[in-house]
Amino acid sequence: MEDLKKTVDDINSRDDIEFVIMAGDVTEFGADWELEAAHEIFEELDVPYYIVPGNHDTKWSESGCNSFARIFGGTDFAFESHGILFCGTSSGPNMRMGMAQVPRESIIWLDSLISATPDGMPIIYTNHNPMDASLSNVAEVYDVLKKGNIQLTLAGHWHTDNLKNYDGVPAIVGRSTLRSTPPSKVVGYNIITIDTTTMHLTVRNHESGGKDGKVWAEVDMKPFDPSIQTTRPDYSLNEKYPNATTVWEKQETADIGSGFASDGTRLFYATAAGEIKSIYARTGGDVWSYKTGGRIYSFPAYSAGRVVCASTDGNVYCLNAKNGRLIWVHPTGKGIVACPLVEEGVVYVGSSAGEFYAIDLMSGDRKWTFDGVKGFIEARAVADDEKVYIGSWGNEFYALDRKDGTLVWKWNNTGSRMYSAAACWPVISGDKVFITTPERATRALDKNTGEEIWFSKEPNGRESQGISLDGKELYVKTMLTNELVAVDAVADTCKIVWKCPLPNDQDMDLAPAPIMSNSNAVFVPSSIGKVYAVSRDGSRVIWAKKLSNTVINHIMPLDEKTVVASTMDGKIVCISYTEN
């Protein structure tokens, strides 16, 4: 925060700056206290400022991305100055690791904004992520921006100064304010000057407390040429696997950041806009919808005719599965991004208040609270007859007594909290509980003591893992080598059973979604909208299908020949397949 304060003081010492645009990453971890501290400094500016969140503000957000909007007044902005429209949107990824993605709600807002902008008005657009292929839905954003006279995009993320041109649109990727920014290694910022007579734009670096640097970028603004084509994702994969066909598809108006539960007839899911919904599994037809008071990144759970889901408004909701009517609501006092587990009439779920709860499914009464959680909880717990197991974004993993919530043991992953066992869903087999953490390490912990039975980086997974139906194999999706790895879950060492290459041309795959299976296939998610079905023996990819260019949240088998999947940009797709 010291570097930001020095930057603000320097800006206030000048009389030639009209406004400030901050292109995201105002925090390291998106914690409420970090956002509040940054906001306090920004509020000291003597000129207006406009801000969008970056990936560090949204990926690890304990509030489910609510606090940024609450503290700064929103995640998108638009204003006019000297006949130019300046606008900006968030680019996430919100809560789920993957490529950046402008939320669907923001694209809809941006489209309405550009449609209402006078013809020919120059547009300068800000997004934390550069407008290249690392922004998963960049083509959709350009489709909107190119309806108007887009002149320039501004971005951060790289922490260094770059002048680029993406799909015919000049792009300024600017330095951070941090003194660690190369090559200068001093606190600073960029000053953009626009001559509105000649429409000539210059960018110079300024060292806080020092002199203006030389101009390092120049852009001549002129009417955008709409004949320049936009680069689009490649969907040719779908032609290679005709044995996988779409049964039905549904597009939400908001992002989806979670997966499904089912009663066999209906599917239950939630949107980032805060709605819990039910649709028919075989047709995708709407059944009911229930609106909560916050955003939702929680997977619903189904049991005994009831649907349980948590919201970032701080409540756990229990709804009638048939009609969506509220049965009970359980307040926790702080936002929840965790996914509930229901076992034997008890709901187990963590929150962002440093707590983990057991709630009676029938009454909604709290049975016990464990208040020793460091950080916040994101994943779904796993339970055996005696204990429930869950990790947190405080580098800790807990085994709690199911009867009273007593801490049985605690494991700690030393080092950065970004290596926490928090996004992976833990799985159990025999006397082991398995976790895969972001330093690309997989561990088997003793369920009774928490001691490491084995540790290995050979599976090369980041967070996405699952267990076979018979509990004999642990599945891990690799981060860098585009493979599904099966590990012997019975052995007391990391014994690789097989590796199956996946038809993925990305340099890395970060999607944290759990790996599911049925009797004939293992279903593997990706961060670029691809779904893979791998044979149970790992000998081949049965089929693969690209649904989107964004993160796959969940792939749930409906039967032995049908699955349903959701994508971060709000798609739900039902797929039927054969084993040809």
Spans of features found by a protein language model:
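Blade-level signature of beta-propeller repeat domains, shared across WD40, Kelch, NHL, RCC1
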Residues: 547-580
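Short loop/turn segments that connect beta-strands within beta-propeller blades
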Residues: 280-284, 320-324, 360-364, 401-405, ...
